[in-house]
Amino acid sequence: MLEFEGRIIDTDAQGYLKNSTDWSEALAPVLAEQEGITLTEPHWEVVRFVRAFYQEFNTSPAIRMLVKAMAQKYGEEKGNSRYLYRLFPKGPAKQATKIAGLPKPVKCI
């Protein structure tokens, strides 16, 4: 759990929010800092993308799904694992969904 803006937010043992409705754009930099990431506009693009993906499909995208969906929307330049790993070095699907306040992708270890 973590304290943010005077309230306690429940997280699991790995730091994922237990309730995605606790998330806000103001909380994202705090979650990113815990991952050793300073959010830049390219990070925000991916974070907002995975949130939109979750809202549409009711699941957090695993890495293959994330790469494919990013390529469809943004093209090969951003829709490839090398680009995503530069932004999220410990795992784009895991770190982006955590920062976006979403559940851990099912196919992530």
Curated annotation (Swiss-Prot):
> What is the recorded function of this protein according to its Swiss-Prot or TrEMBL entry?
Part of a sulfur-relay system required for 2-thiolation of 5-methylaminomethyl-2-thiouridine (mnm(5)s(2)U) at tRNA wobble positions. Could accept sulfur from TusD.
Which NCBIfam families does the record match to this protein?
dsrC_tusE_dsvC (TIGR03342), PRK11508.1 (NF008562)
- Transmembrane ranges, per UniProt, are none
- What family is this? Belongs to the DsrC/TusE family.
User: Which processes are annotated in GO (biological process)?
Assistant: tRNA wobble position uridine thiolation
Q: What are the subcellular locations of this protein?
A: Cytoplasm
User: Could you say which EC number(s) this protein's record lists?
Assistant: 2.8.1.-
The molecular function terms in GO held by this entry are:
sulfur carrier activity; transferase activity
Keyword Ribonucleoprotein appears in the UniProt entry: no
Keywords (A to Z) from UniProt: Cytoplasm, Transferase, tRNA processing
Question: How would you summarize the oligomeric state and partners of this protein?
Answer: Interacts with the TusBCD complex. Interacts with MnmA.
Q: What is this protein called?
A: Sulfurtransferase TusE
Major place of residence: cytoplasm
Q: Specify the species.
A: Yersinia pestis
On whether Cytoplasm is a keyword of this UniProt record, the answer is: yes
Q: Which Pfam families match?
A: DsrC
